[in-house]
Amino acid sequence: MPKIDEMQLKKEIKSGDFKNAYLLYGEESYLKEYYANELKNKIVDKTFEAFNYHSFDGKDTELDDILKDAQMLPMMSEYNFVLVKDYPIEKSSNDIKLLEEYLSDAPDSTVLLFWFDALDPDVKSAKFKKVIKAFEKAGNCVELQKRSENDVAKLLVNGAKKRGALLDINVAKYLISVSGNDMKNLLNELDKLAYYANGGEITKDIVDNMATKCLQARIYDLSKYVVAGKSSMAYDVLNTLFEMKEEPIIILSAVSGVYVDMYRVKCAKNAGLGFDLALIHI
């Protein structure tokens, strides 16, 4: 079976037409965890969860133990569900061979799910490609990448509505610029902002006053204050960054980048380019 996308995975979960194996990987941690939980909640009957649900942390287990549980028959349910988080499957050729053998003849009554959170496999490596190929024989592989700014902003607008608050799409995009594009973090911020709005609108002022700024936003503020000559405010931001244990070289690099951009604009303007064309050269 070929790789499928997020929409196809949604359809499978909704229809209940499950495959015997799933591999979830990619950049977006929130989506991987979300769909792992969605599969579990749809497949596992809570009445018999103690018998039919087996969860493993890859740091603390062996593949043999995982596959033994995957061979078990379900009790009073259609499926035995085995969830494996962060198992370094591509590190061992022997593990890959064992997994290939299992997936080549996977039992129809088991759904085996591998997903990666803290562990970041090298998806371009020959070993991981073998893992993908093995999973495709018995099920589906889904690469969940970070969504576009527009998609995340729409999710935040809908999320605010579910929380009893209003959020304009442009304010949602501003929140992304302030707090970063990590969906799990953004939804945590949304919980806080919606509570503060108390059934009203989440405004730009509320975001400025309540949202936690990501590293990029804080460094942008630092650069802005340095360029404007506001040394006191710049030192306040710098102290906050040091309290966050940020590396000085990263901070220096980001601030230096602002001066490089200004120099590029100056050179472009000196070359007779208009303001809009000068910006293109940044």
What are these regions (language model features)?
Residues M1-I280:
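Conserved beta/loop motifs at nucleotide-recognition and modification sites
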